[in-house]
C-alpha cells in the first residue's frame, strides 16, 4: 500500500471518529494492529499531526461564535469571559494528568486489548446514559456554570486511556451534569480545540526529528482529508444526536470492541 493511500485512510478514520463518542485513538490503534496502517515512528506522529485538520474543521464551523467570544472577552462581556475561563478550567486537568502520567499511560495502556475492552465498557455506559430520564437544565455550551466545566474536564482525563473517547467522556459528563445532548456535544467540540492543539504541539516538538520535507506531502494529504471528513461528520452528528441520541454510537463501540477481542483471541 502506498503512503498516499495510507494517509487518506488514516485521515478518514481521524475525521470520522475524532468528534464522535467512539474513540479516534482506539480506532487508529486497531487499524494499525489489524491492517498494518501507520506502523513506525513517523506514522505515530502522523496520527497526531492530522488532528490539526479536524481541529480546524471545528474552528471553521463555529468561527462566528468563537469570534464573538474573542471580541466579547476583550470588550468586557461577562459571559464571553466566563466561557473562556471555563474552557481553560476544563482543559487544565488534562494538562496535569498528561504531564504526570502520560508516559505511563502510553507505555502500559496503549495496546489493542485495552482498546477493545474500553470500547465495550464505554458503549455500555453510553447506552445507560442515553436511556436515563434526564432533565436538562443547560442548553447553551457557552454558559455552563464554572464548576460544571471543571467536572467535565476531570472526566475528559479518563479518555487518556485509549478506547475511552475524549468526546464520549466529556459528553457523558456534561449530560449527567444537566446539559442537553446538543450542548454536551458542542462543548466537547470547543474543549477539543485547546486539548488537541496542546497534544499536537507537544508531539510535534517531541518528534520533530522524524519530520522531514519528504513527509510534508503525506501529512498534507492526511490533514486535508481529516478536515473535509470532520466538517461533514460534525454537521451530521449534531442533527442526528438531537433527534436520535447516542444509541447507534454505543452499539458501534460494542460491535467493534467485540470483533477486536475475537480477532485478538484468534491470534490475529
UniProtKB/Swiss-Prot annotation:
Main localization of the protein described in the UniProt heading: membrane
Membrane protein topology class: Multi-pass membrane protein
Catalytic reaction list: di-trans,octa-cis-undecaprenyl diphosphate + H2O = di-trans,octa-cis-undecaprenyl phosphate + phosphate + H(+)
Keywords: Antibiotic resistance, Cell inner membrane, Cell membrane, Cell shape, Cell wall biogenesis/degradation, Hydrolase, Membrane, Peptidoglycan synthesis, Transmembrane, Transmembrane helix
EC number: 3.6.1.27
Miscellaneous comment text of the record: Bacitracin is thought to be involved in the inhibition of peptidoglycan synthesis by sequestering undecaprenyl diphosphate, thereby reducing the pool of lipid carrier available.
Pfam families for this protein: BacA
Domain of life according to the entry: Bacteria
Any Gene Ontology biological process: peptidoglycan metabolic process
Family annotation (InterPro entries): UppP (IPR003824)
First-tier enzyme category under EC: hydrolase
Protein name per Swiss-Prot or TrEMBL: Undecaprenyl-diphosphatase
Family that this chain belongs to: Belongs to the UppP family.
Compartment(s): Cell inner membrane
Transmembrane segments: 8-28, 41-61, 83-103, 108-128, 144-164, 184-204, 218-238, 246-266
Function, as annotated: Catalyzes the dephosphorylation of undecaprenyl diphosphate (UPP). Confers resistance to bacitracin.
One MF annotation (Gene Ontology) recorded for this entry: undecaprenyl-diphosphatase activity
HAMAP family: Undec_diphosphatase (MF_01006)
Organism of provenance: Bradyrhizobium diazoefficiens (strain JCM 10833 / BCRC 13528 / IAM 13628 / NBRC 14792 / USDA 110)
GO cellular component: plasma membrane
Amino acid at each position: 500500500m502506498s503512503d498516499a493511500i495510507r494517509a487518506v485512510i488514516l485521515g478518514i478514520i481521524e475525521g470520522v471518529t475524532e468528534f464522535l463518542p467512539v474513540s479516534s485513538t482506539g480506532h487508529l490503534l486497531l487499524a494499525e494492529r489489524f491492517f498494518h496502517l501507520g506502523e513506525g515512528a513517523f506514522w505515530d506522529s502522523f496520527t497526531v499531526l492530522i488532528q490539526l485538520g479536524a481541529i480546524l474543521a471545528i474552528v471553521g464551523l463555529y468561527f462566528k461564535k468563537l469570534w464573538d467570544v474573542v471580541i466579547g472577552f476583550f470588550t468586557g462581556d461577562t459571559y464571553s469571559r466566563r466561557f473562556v475561563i471555563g474552557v481553560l478550567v476544563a482543559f487544565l486537568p488534562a494538562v496535569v494528568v498528561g504531564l504526570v502520567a502520560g508516559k505511563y499511560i502510553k507505555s502500559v495502556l496503549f495496546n489493542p486489548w485495552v482498546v477493545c475492552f474500553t470500547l465495550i465498557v464505554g458503549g455500555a455506559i453510553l447506552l445507560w446514559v442515553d436511556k436515563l430520564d434526564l432533565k436538562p437544565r443547560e442548553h447553551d455550551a457557552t454558559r455552563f456554570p464554572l464548576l460544571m466545566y471543571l467536572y467535565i474536564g476531570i472526566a475528559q482525563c479518563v479518555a487518556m486511556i485509549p478506547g475511552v473517547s475524549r468526546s464520549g467522556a466529556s459528553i457523558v459528563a456534561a449530560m449527567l451534569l444537566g446539559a442537553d445532548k446538543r450542548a454536551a456535544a458542542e462543548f466537547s467540540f470547543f474543549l477539543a480545540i485547546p486539548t488537541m492543539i496542546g497534544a499536537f504541539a507537544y508531539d510535534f516538538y517531541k518528534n520533530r526529528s522524524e519530520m522531514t520535507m519528504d513527509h510534508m506531502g503525506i501529512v498534507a494529504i492526511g490533514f486535508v482529508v481529516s478536515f473535509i471528513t470532520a466538517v461533514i461528520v460534525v454537521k451530521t452528528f449534531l442533527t442526528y444526536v438531537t433527534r436520535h441520541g447516542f444509541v447507534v454510537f454505543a452499539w458501534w463501540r460494542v460491535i467493534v470492541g467485540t470483533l477486536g477481542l475475537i480477532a485478538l483471541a484468534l491470534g490475529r
